[in-house]
Amino acid sequence: MTVIAQPGADVRVRTLSSEDEFTELADVWDDLVLAMTRPSPFLLHTWLREWWRHYANDGQLAIHVAYRGDRLVGALPLSVRRRHGLRITEFIGGWALLADVLIARGEDESVVAGALAERASTMDHDFADLYGLTGASRLVAALPPADFRLIERLEAPILELSSGWEAVSQSKLSPKARSMRRRRRRQLEAVGPVEVALARTREELAPALEEAFRVHALRWQGRNDSSEFATPVGKAFHRAALLRLADDDAVRLLTLSVNGKPIAFALSVQLADRAYGLRRAFDPAFGRFSPGSEAKLLSLEAAAAEGMERSEFLGAAAPHNVRFADTFDPICQGIGLARTPRGRVAVAALLAGIRIRRTLKRSATARRLYARARRLKGTRA
C-alpha cells in the first residue's frame, strides 16, 4: 500500500493495490456512492468487486482513497491494464457508466477531488482512457484541460417519473400508440396466456436471470453484441453481482411470458430513487407483438409505482428511448494524462480515430436522410 501526503489540506491519499484491501472498505464505500449528485450503481462496492473478480486477468488495481484523519472522504476506483503493449488506466468495470471521483458529504470537493486527481495524473501508466464520465465530472474539473480530453459518447436519455405513471404515459404515449399497445396485447393473448412477473429477491431473480440470458441470446443471435451479457464470463459476473445486489433489494427483472415461456425482459437497478436500465431483450419469434416495448413500459410503470423519481436509459438516443426522454445527460469518454512518448502517440491516434468514426457516422446518416427525402419527393410527385 502506497501512502502519499497532500500538502496543506489535511487529506492523505492511499493507493489500494489488492482485492483484500478493497474488501475492507465494504461497509463505508457505498456511502460515497450515495453522496454523488448522480449516484452510479456501477460504482457500488459489490458491483466493482465482482467485476474485478471476473475480469481482472492481468490487470492491477489502483484504487485511490482519500482520508481525513480516520474517515474515508474520497475515492477514485481505477485499474491499470495492458493493451497493445501499453499500460492504460481505466475505471474498474471498464464500462462503469456515470463513473467519477467519489466525495463524502460535507467535504470540500475541490480539495478532495484535487488530491485524487493529482494522484491519478502521476500514475505509472502510458495514458488514461476513462469511459463513463459525465460533463459535470468533478474529476475532469480537477484535471488540467490541456492534459485530458472529454468526448461525448452516449446521449443518455432520462425520463422523469415523479408525476406518476398515469401522467407520464398520457404525456409520452399518443392515443394512437396506446391503442396500438392494447391491440398488440390482445393479439399476444390470442397466442396463449400472458404473464408478467417482477423478480427482486435472490430466490426470484436466480431462475429469471437464466431466462433473461436465453432471451438475450435469441435476440442477438448472428448479430454483433458487445454487451458481455451472454458470454460465459459475462453471465458468471452478472449472476454474482446481481444476486448480491438483490440482497439489498436493488435489482428488478421484469419478465413477459406467453404459455409459461419468457419472451421479453427488462432488467434494471434501483438506487437513490432512480431506476437505471441495465439490459432489455425479446425473442424475435414474437417480434410482431412488440414484446420488448411492452416489457419496457411495464418496467417503467412498476418503477413509478415504487416511488422512483426518474429512469435513466443510459444508452444512445435511439428512437425507442428518445420518445420517452424528458432530458439528456450525456456519458463521455475521457482520454489523456499521457506519461510517456508512446502514451502521447496513442492518445493522439485514439482521438483521431474517434473523430474519423464520428465524421463517417454523420456522413452515413446524412446520406440516408438525403435518400429518404428523395424517395419522399418522388412519391409526392
Predicted regions and their residues:
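Short, high-confidence coil segments that cap the C-terminus of an alpha-helix
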Residues: 59-61, 123-125, 251, 305-308
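Residues forming anionic-ligand binding surfaces in small-molecule and nucleic-acid pockets
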Residues: 90-97
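Aromatic (often tryptophan-rich) hydrophobic motifs at membrane interfaces
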Residues: 66-67, 96, 107-108, 112-118, ...
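The substrate-binding groove and active-site-proximal loops of carbohydrate-active enzymes
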Residues: 99-104
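Long, C-terminal catalytic modules of enzymes
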Residues: 370, 374-376
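ATP-hydrolysis module of ASCE/P-loop NTPase motor domains
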Residues: 121-138
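A conserved beta-strand-loop-helix scaffold within acyl/acetyltransferase catalytic domains
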Residues: 13-69, 73-88, 133-152, 156, ...
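Active-site/acyl-donor-binding loops of N-acyltransferases
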Residues: 2-11, 15, 19, 80, ...
